[in-house]
Amino acid sequence: MEKINSNSKVDIAAFIYARSDSVRLPRKVFLPLGNESIIEVVLRRAKACLVDKVVLLTSDRAIDDELVEKAIKLNYEIIRGDSKDLIARTLNAIEVIKPKQFVRINADSPFFEPRLLNFILEKNLNYDVITNLLNRTFPYGVAVEVINCNYYKAMAGVAMENEKEHVTQHIYRTINNA
């Protein structure tokens, strides 16, 4: 865990899930997109959303140290955790940051749309999960996920071992089976 200042009240946090390695395209979050790296674009776009705090969630592996250094340099908070258990990393972030809801944003999705997310957040809807990923009609990379933290904590126990590498797969499995 690094650079956390949780003195201020946080209703909605944007959790940016990032790692430096990728099987298909290693270090893709550092690739340029215009005048910035992809991770810089994602962090900037997240900051434009109606959230109280933007936090980078990454692994505790040395390969992600450069990513952490970049986020610190840009003045973002960081939560580090197990590279294979994103549910545990998310639960840790919820415990440290203490938001009521969190927005999930993937660091390799520079085209996620802040206006779409803000449209949802402006409604101030009190649901367990708000998403456009079920019965997908939006293009890939334009995902919206807003999750109630109490619901997420309650649902963490239903995750199967193979779902721990994913932030919300266990939730969608239970929704689809309902």
Language model: regions and residue ranges:
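Catalytic alpha-helical scaffold of carbohydrate-active enzymes acting on polysaccharides/glycoconjugates
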Residues: 31, 35-38
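N-terminal nucleotide-binding beta1-loop-alpha1 segment
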Residues: 1-25
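Hydrophobic targeting segments
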Residues: 11-16, 39, 53-56
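Short phosphate-binding loop-to-helix
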Residues: 61-123
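Conserved core of the sugar-phosphate nucleotidyltransferase
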Residues: 112-178
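A short, N-terminal amphipathic alpha-helix
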Residues: 38-54, 69, 73-74
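Short aromatic/basic micro-patch
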Residues: 24, 32, 111, 146
